[in-house]
From Swiss-Prot:
Belongs to the sulfotransferase 1 family. It comes from the Eukaryota. Its main location: cytoplasm. It catalyses: a phenol + 3'-phosphoadenylyl sulfate = an aryl sulfate + adenosine 3',5'-bisphosphate + H(+); 3,3',5-triiodo-L-thyronine + 3'-phosphoadenylyl sulfate = 3,3',5-triiodo-L-thyronine sulfate + adenosine 3',5'-bisphosphate + H(+); 3,3',5'-triiodo-L-thyronine + 3'-phosphoadenylyl sulfate = 3,3',5'-triiodo-L-thyronine sulfate + adenosine 3',5'-bisphosphate + H(+); 3,3'-diiodo-L-thyronine + 3'-phosphoadenylyl sulfate = 3,3'-diiodo-L-thyronine sulfate + adenosine 3',5'-bisphosphate + H(+). This is Sulfotransferase 1B1. Pfam families: Sulfotransfer_1. The active site is at 109 (proton acceptor). Sulfotransferase that utilizes 3'-phospho-5'-adenylyl sulfate (PAPS) as sulfonate donor to catalyze the sulfate conjugation of dopamine, small phenols such as 1-naphthol and p-nitrophenol and thyroid hormones, including 3,3'-diiodothyronine, triidothyronine (T3) and reverse triiodothyronine (rT3). GO terms for molecular function: aryl sulfotransferase activity. It is found in: Cytoplasm.
Length: 296
């Protein structure tokens, strides 16, 4: 399976009963057996929930708020994605991470219950970002249109049903957001919300810095909030994924950084779809105190 054609637009594979990107699922042992280090910082999200955004924020905090240092390399190299693989095109995430000096920032979308055991055993700090399900579904649909590592999403209606049923990469959004939420009692997890970041980015950056034990000046906090605005990141070649080969991601179909707003779901969901989704959501989120905002 070394050629690109062997894994582009292929159906999902399955890893530990979770749907997974075909290219990533090959040789999953490298992920299961991955050895963490106690000072690793894990950035975890369900896809399309602000992963690149929080990754850039964490890197900037570690660099003391210096934007020049964050332009030293593309985000995919500064914050490797643990499970990523695109044989013959780009290095695997596990390979990149093994060669990185500490402290490493490790990005992942892997659900909590199948995250490599080593991260839990070593009590690595984790930063999780949750985003409301309706906006995630819309963003993920557009992402799957342009990301050839995923199968074609079909129509929006078909995709929404698949999303609700957990038949998308990384499985159920509901299980994912709850999985990390429930583990935060016993594990050092800072649980953030995309909507809070949109509302007051500087406040949320300060939370992350405090969680990581990093003292930042007011000037550094301002610099990070400015540098990590959606507009700045969309126009920054080191964060906008323009380095990813067009064979894998076609930015002409939909840019990797598309809108970065809360409430775009209203432009896609019909009234009937929204009502159907809300009913299903209430069932799946029963019994948890985890709450999301669908508008700000």
């Amino acid at each position: 399976m070394g050629t690109v054609d062997a894994y582009l637009r292929q159906p999902w594979s399955t890893v530990h009963a979770i749907p997974m990107v075909s290219a990533f699922a090959q040789n999953w042992e490298r992920v299961d057996n991955f050895q963490s280090r106690p000072d690793d910082i894990v950035v975890a999200t369900f896809p399309k929930s602000g992963t690149t955004w929080i990754s850039e924020i964490v890197d900037m905090i570690l660099q003391g708020g210096d934007p020049k240092k964050c332009k030293r390399d593309a985000i995919v190299n500064r914050v490797p994605m643990l499970e990523f693989a695109a044989p013959g095109q780009m290095p695997a995430g596990t390979e990149q991470l093994e060669n990185m000096p500490s402290p490493r920032i490790i990005k992942t979308h892997i659900p909590a219950d199948i995250l490599p055991k080593s991260f839990w055993d070593k009590s690595c700090k984790m930063i999780y970002v949750g985003r409301n399900a309706k906006d995630v579904a819309v963003s993920y649909y557009h992402f799957d249109l342009m990301n050839k590592l995923h199968p074609h999403p079909g129509t929006w209606d078909q995709y929404l049903e698949a999303f609700m049923a957990g038949k998308v990469a990384y499985g159920s959004w509901f299980d994912h957001v709850r999985g990390y939420w429930e583990r935060r009692q016993e594990h050092p997890i800072l649980y953030l919300f995309y909507e809070d970041m949109k509302e007051d980015l500087r406040r949320e950056v300060a939370k992350v810095a405090q969680f990581l034990g990093r003292e930042l000046t007011e000037v550094a906090l301002d610099a990070i909030a400015h540098h990590t605005s959606f507009e700045a990141m969309r126009d920054n070649p080191s964060t906008n994924y323009s380095v990813v080969p067009s064979q894998l991601m076609d930015h002409g179909i939909s840019p990797f950084m598309r809108k970065g707003i809360t409430g775009d779901w209203k432009n896609h969901f019909t009234v009937a779809q929204s009502a159907h989704f809300d009913q299903y959501y209430a069932q799946k989120m029963a019994g948890t105190d985890l709450r999301f905002r669908t508008h700000i």
